[in-house]
Amino acid sequence: MKKPIYYLPGHGGVLQKGLGAALLARGHEVMGRETVGEFNRLPFGQQVEVIAQDLTAHFTQSDAQVIANSFGAYLFMHAQAQMQPFAGRVLLLSPIVGEFGSDELQRKTHLNFIPPRADLLYELAKKGTYPIPQNAEFHVGSEDWQSNPENVLALAQMWGVQSHMVPGSGHAIDRGYITQLLDRWLT
């Protein structure tokens, strides 16, 4: 089995389905936290602390890998905020980076979401105090209403890391794109 990957799925996600299943099929051991059950019932701050402890205990090497999706990426970024810069590689897919929604979106869909500590990532990035992972990249769909592409690209620019907008994709980035991305990223 290949080196383990620390995987954080989106809200309600489990490690052996979706992207986790794709990683397992490629021969990787998948570790991380499922965003369901007992872990999901923890307060946000405790979730962040558990992830930070996991990473500090088992994923400190320069060849360590983290893949986080949607709200899992939000959890990772908050855990990273209280750690030394992650030494390995980080792949953030459709990352929640703070509040999403707008007056227009609210009128059309009645949807708006403000996650816990919604402003923290931008505040730390603006101050230059966020402990930026040494090798990170962001991928977001151009039509993603949850991970506002403009906000994702702005945060990636503040961090000085790679960012990619996937044309025509929503929050669930096109499977073909993800397959090609994993082919490149995991080699």
Residue positions per predicted region:
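Conserved alpha/beta-hydrolase "acid-adjacent" motif
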Residues: 16-17, 145-151, 174
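Gly/Ala-rich beta-loop-alpha elbow adjacent to hydrolase catalytic centers
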Residues: 67-77
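Active-site nucleophile elbow and catalytic-triad environment of alpha/beta-hydrolase enzymes
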Residues: 110-129
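Active-site catalytic motif of lipid deacylating hydrolases and related acyltransferases
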Residues: 2-60
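Short beta-strand/loop motif that positions the catalytic acidic residue
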Residues: 132-133, 137-140, 144, 152
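Short glycine-rich catalytic loops that host catalytic nucleophiles or stabilize transition states
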Residues: 33-37, 164-170
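Active-site nucleophile loop of the alpha/beta-hydrolase fold
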Residues: 35-38, 91-100
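Catalytic histidine-centered segment of alpha/beta-hydrolase-like enzymes
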Residues: 41-43, 169-179
